[in-house]
Amino acid sequence: KLIPLGQSAGQNILFTLAERIPEVVAQSAIWPLDDIGSFTPAQIIASSRHETQYTRLFRS
């Protein structure tokens, strides 16, 4: 939602990151609950602007 991205580019990114998913899942299973969280106001604002963007997520 943060950047205008075509469907093919989005699929390429997902394919590239797919091999890291098991590693990230394993790491997340051992993180203490106190360390899990986020404070990302810029991401929230950018996501809210997504709705009115000319180019939207996976626009064909």
From Swiss-Prot:
It is found in: Cytoplasm. It comes from the Bacteria. Transmembrane segments: none annotated. The keyword Chaperone applies. The keyword Hydrolase does not apply. Keywords: Chaperone, Cytoplasm, Nickel insertion, Plasmid. GO terms for cellular component: cytoplasm. Induction: The probable operon is induced by urea. Belongs to the UreF family. Required for maturation of urease via the functional incorporation of the urease nickel metallocenter. UreD, UreF and UreG form a complex that acts as a GTP-hydrolysis-dependent molecular chaperone, activating the urease apoprotein by helping to assemble the nickel containing metallocenter of UreC. The UreE protein probably delivers the nickel. This is Urease accessory protein UreF.
